[in-house]
Structure formats: structure tokens, C-alpha cells
């Protein structure tokens, strides 16, 4: 089964300094049909105006991933980290027993565009941590998150994998799905056809009870592929 979550059907909140689209229920957006998918709890597509950002606030027992698409985010947290995360890089934070952090757009002229993704951990009460990394493969399917941090990927405390998959126009490829696993695909750019279903930038696809995904790039495209545990 494939369910297409169209970009314009997501929850939307424009706060002036922040324009945010919510794939799943978040803050004042609530839809009981979209509370998450497997271990995925939040996919927020955020545009933050120059000099603006999220002030210091707490989190607990959540894996929080940021993928910067445009601009740079300045991260500070209660573990003493102060880092700049430029476009193309991923950062992950295990909130675990508790953490406080802020995320700002340090530019005085340029906007910041990012995905903020929350993943429920396999267990609560883990030690907080922070990592960031650039993945340099321009094309193909590259492992970004895994439970064992293999092949240079970032560690995630969950039985899941995240791939960044970049394809040139008319390229076609296949991803096998293990029994009972679930897959979420988020289209970062371009237009793709997945098992016959057409999707475009900012669309999402929930996939279950499928043995494989066949993806065709209708234009130069990039997707995030989440290989998730059974429900």
C-alpha cells in the first residue's frame, strides 16, 4: 500500500518569522489520522527568516534530526555545544534524560530552510548526545542514520535507517523492503514516480505491505527514505 501525503494537505502555521508545514500533528495542528508513522513522530518543513529562530527550550526522550536545505543554522545546547550547520549537513541530537537547546538563523539577510524530524527512541532515559555530519555523495543512495552508525552514518537509537537518495532525470532504481517493515519517503526536490504513484517536492509517501520500491526520477530529484520498524 502507498498513501500519498500531498504537500498542500499538511498542517500549516505562519508566524511571520517562521513558516512551518507539519506532516504530522504538531503544536496547534492536530489530525488524529496523522499522529506519526511507525517511529516517525514529526516532519516539519521550516523556513526561518534572517536573524530569527527557536529560543532555548527543553526536550526529553526523542531523537531530533535536522537537515539543512538552504542557509545555515546556529545550534547551542546545554551540553556545551555551539555549532554552525550549513546547507547539506545533518545534525542529530538524542534528548534522552533531558536537554535544552536553541536553533537560530545567524544570517542578517538570508533565510534558513530546513527539515526538523523527530524519531521516537527504542528506549527512554538514554544519555543526551549531539552529532553533525556532511555526506558528500552527490548521486545515489547514501546511508545517513543507522542504529550501529555503520558506513560513516550517524547513530540513531531506533531500529531504523535513513537514506538520502539523489537521482538524475530519467534514472530508475529499486529499494528492497524487508518483511513487515514500513517506509516513509519525503521528496526534498524534484518529481518522482514510486511504484506508479507520482510525487513532487515536499510530498510524502507512507508505504507498507510492499516488497520493494521502484523509483523513477521524472526530473533531477532528491528524496529521504526512512526504513522503519513494524508497528
From Swiss-Prot:
Manner of cofactor binding, per the entry note: Binds 1 divalent metal cation, Zn(2+), Co(2+) or Fe(2+).
InterPro entries linked to this entry: Pirin, Pirin_N_dom, Quercetinase_C, RmlC-like_jellyroll, RmlC_Cupin_sf
Cofactor: Zn(2+); Co(2+); Fe(2+)
Keywords: Copper, Dioxygenase, Iron, Metal-binding, Oxidoreductase, Zinc
Record EC number: 1.13.11.24
Binding annotation for a divalent metal cation: 57, 59, 101, 103
Pfam family, one: Pirin
Catalytic activity annotation: quercetin + O2 = 2-(3,4-dihydroxybenzoyloxy)-4,6-dihydroxybenzoate + CO
Any GO MF annotation of the entry: quercetin 2,3-dioxygenase activity
Keyword Zinc assigned: yes
Annotated Gene3D superfamilies: Jelly Rolls
Pathway the protein acts in: Flavonoid metabolism; quercetin degradation
Domain of life of the organism encoding this protein: Bacteria
CDD domains cross-referenced by the UniProt entry: cupin_Yhhw_C (cd20311), cupin_Yhhw_N (cd02910)
Domain-level remarks: Is composed of two structurally similar domains arranged face to face.
Extra information: Quercetin is a flavonoid compound synthesized by a variety of plants, including foods for human consumption.
Role played: Has quercetin 2,3-dioxygenase activity in vitro. Its physiological role is unknown; however, may provide a mechanism that would avoid inhibition of key cellular proteins, such as DNA gyrase, by quercetin.
Family indicated by similarity: Belongs to the pirin family.
The protein's name: Quercetin 2,3-dioxygenase
Species per Swiss-Prot/TrEMBL record: Escherichia coli O157:H7
Amino acid at each position: 500500500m502507498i498513501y500519498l501525503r500531498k504537500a498542500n494537505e499538511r498542517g500549516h502555521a505562519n508566524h511571520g518569522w517562521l513558516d512551518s508545514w507539519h506532516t504530522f500533528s504538531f503544536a496547534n495542528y492536530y489530525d488524529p489520522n496523522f499522529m506519526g508513522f511507525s517511529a516517525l513522530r514529526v516532519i516539519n518543513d521550516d523556513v526561518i527568516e534572517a536573524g530569527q529562530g527557536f529560543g532555548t527550550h527543553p526536550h526529553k526522550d526523542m531523537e531530533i534530526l535536522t537537515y539543512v536545505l538552504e542557509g545555515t543554522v546556529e545550534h547551542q545546547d546545554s551540553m556545551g555545544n555551539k555549532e554552525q550547520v550549513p546547507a547539506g549537513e545533518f545534525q542529530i541530537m538524542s534528548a534522552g534524560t533531558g536537554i535544552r537547546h536553541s536553533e537560530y538563523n545567524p544570517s542578517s539577510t538570508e533565510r534558513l530552510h530546513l527539515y526538523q524530524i523527530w524519531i521516537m527512541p527504542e528506549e527512554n532515559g538514554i544519555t543526551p548526545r549531539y552529532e553533525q555530519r556532511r555526506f558528500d555523495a552527490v548521486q545515489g543512495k547514501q546511508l545517513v542514520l543507522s542504529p550501529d552508525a555503520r558506513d560513516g552514518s550517524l547513530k540513531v537509537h531506533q531500529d531504523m535507517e535513513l537514506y538520502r537518495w539523489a537521482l538524475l532525470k530519467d534514472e530508475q532504481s529499486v529499494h528492497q523492503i524487508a518483511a513487515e517493515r514500513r517506509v516513509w519517503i519525503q521528496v526534498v526536490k524534484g518529481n518522482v514516480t514510486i511504484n506508479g504513484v507520482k510525487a513532487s517536492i515536499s510530498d510524502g509517501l507512507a508505504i507498507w505491505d510492499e516488497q520493494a520500491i521502484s523509483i523513477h526520477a521524472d526530473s533531477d530529484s532528491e528524496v529521504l527514505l526512512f526504513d522503519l520498524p513494524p508497528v
